[in-house]
């Protein structure tokens, strides 16, 4: 498996719809010239953006977090240009970008250092061969203070790895439970 370059990412996005919407360069300022957390194509990856759709953990109903029987009341829905994650808490969001991963490609997604240096950890599992959808993002605030995340700005980087051969069974072939997700998607057992 080899990591893919900016040229490959641009070609796959523009000719095969791998990333939509797609930014061929690296954006570091908003339309008003204000600095933002960068997004778009980098040398060997793509910096994804957070959409203005969030689910923030709440303890109002005092339910147990069970991945096999998840209670949707564990989250409060929030829409906005930014989101405050309470101290030592957690939020879900989704990407602004929709992904279509080729059959011979696997991605790894890593949080951006701008957030990590503030104690905000972004976790995303790999995008498997032939998976498609909006990516659900997991944000952990590891600090004893409220933490702010921004919609429309970079939050993590996707690295693309192309295999020497196609897999026998892709995510699509096995009917993966998160195939085609369109919003912030909660755990499915």
UniProtKB/Swiss-Prot annotation:
<dbReference type="InterPro" id="IPR036157">
    <property type="entry name" value="dUTPase-like_sf"/>
</dbReference>
<feature type="binding site">
    <location>
        <position position="171"/>
    </location>
    <ligand>
        <name>dCTP</name>
    </ligand>
</feature>
<keyword id="KW-0378">Hydrolase</keyword>
<comment type="pathway">
    <text>Pyrimidine metabolism; dUMP biosynthesis; dUMP from dCTP (dUTP route): step 1/2.</text>
</comment>
<dbReference type="GO" id="GO:0008829">
    <property type="term" value="F:dCTP deaminase activity"/>
</dbReference>
<comment type="function">
    <text>Catalyzes the deamination of dCTP to dUTP.</text>
</comment>
<feature type="binding site">
    <location>
        <begin position="136"/>
        <end position="138"/>
    </location>
    <ligand>
        <name>dCTP</name>
    </ligand>
</feature>
<dbReference type="InterPro" id="IPR011962">
    <property type="entry name" value="dCTP_deaminase"/>
</dbReference>
<feature type="binding site">
    <location>
        <position position="181"/>
    </location>
    <ligand>
        <name>dCTP</name>
    </ligand>
</feature>
<comment type="subunit">
    <text>Homotrimer.</text>
</comment>
<dbReference type="GO" id="GO:0015949">
    <property type="term" value="P:nucleobase-containing small molecule interconversion"/>
</dbReference>
<keyword id="KW-0546">Nucleotide metabolism</keyword>
<dbReference type="InterPro" id="IPR033704">
    <property type="entry name" value="dUTPase_trimeric"/>
</dbReference>
<comment type="similarity">
    <text>Belongs to the dCTP deaminase family.</text>
</comment>
<dbReference type="GO" id="GO:0000166">
    <property type="term" value="F:nucleotide binding"/>
</dbReference>
<feature type="binding site">
    <location>
        <begin position="112"/>
        <end position="117"/>
    </location>
    <ligand>
        <name>dCTP</name>
    </ligand>
</feature>
<feature type="active site" description="Proton donor/acceptor">
    <location>
        <position position="138"/>
    </location>
</feature>
<keyword id="KW-0547">Nucleotide-binding</keyword>
<protein>
    <recommendedName>
        <fullName>dCTP deaminase</fullName>
        <ecNumber>3.5.4.13</ecNumber>
    </recommendedName>
</protein>
<feature type="binding site">
    <location>
        <position position="157"/>
    </location>
    <ligand>
        <name>dCTP</name>
    </ligand>
</feature>
<dbReference type="GO" id="GO:0006226">
    <property type="term" value="P:dUMP biosynthetic process"/>
</dbReference>
<dbReference type="Pfam" id="PF22769">
    <property type="entry name" value="DCD"/>
</dbReference>
<dbReference type="GO" id="GO:0006229">
    <property type="term" value="P:dUTP biosynthetic process"/>
</dbReference>
């Amino acid at each position: 498996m080899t990591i893919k370059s900016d040229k490959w990412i641009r070609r796959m996005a523009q000719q095969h719809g791998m990333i939509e919407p797609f930014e061929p360069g690296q954006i570091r300022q908003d339309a008003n010239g204000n600095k933002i957390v960068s997004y778009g194509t980098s040398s060997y990856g793509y910096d994804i953006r957070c959409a203005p759709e969030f689910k923030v953990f709440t303890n109002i109903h005092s339910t147990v977090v069970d991945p096999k029987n998840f209670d949707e009341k564990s989250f409060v829905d929030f829409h906005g240009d930014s989101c405050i994650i309470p101290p030592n808490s957690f939020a879900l969001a989704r990407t602004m970008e929709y992904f279509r991963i080729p059959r011979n490609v696997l991605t790894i997604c890593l949080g951006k250092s701008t957030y990590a240096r503030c104690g905000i950890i972004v976790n995303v599992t790999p995008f498997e061969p032939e998976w498609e959808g909006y990516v659900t993002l997991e944000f952990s605030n590891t600090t004893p203070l409220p933490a702010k995340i921004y919609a429309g700005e970079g939050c993590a980087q996707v690295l693309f790895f192309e295999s020497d051969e196609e897999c026998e069974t892709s995510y699509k072939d096995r009917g993966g439970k998160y195939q085609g997700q369109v919003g912030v998607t909660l755990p499915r057992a």
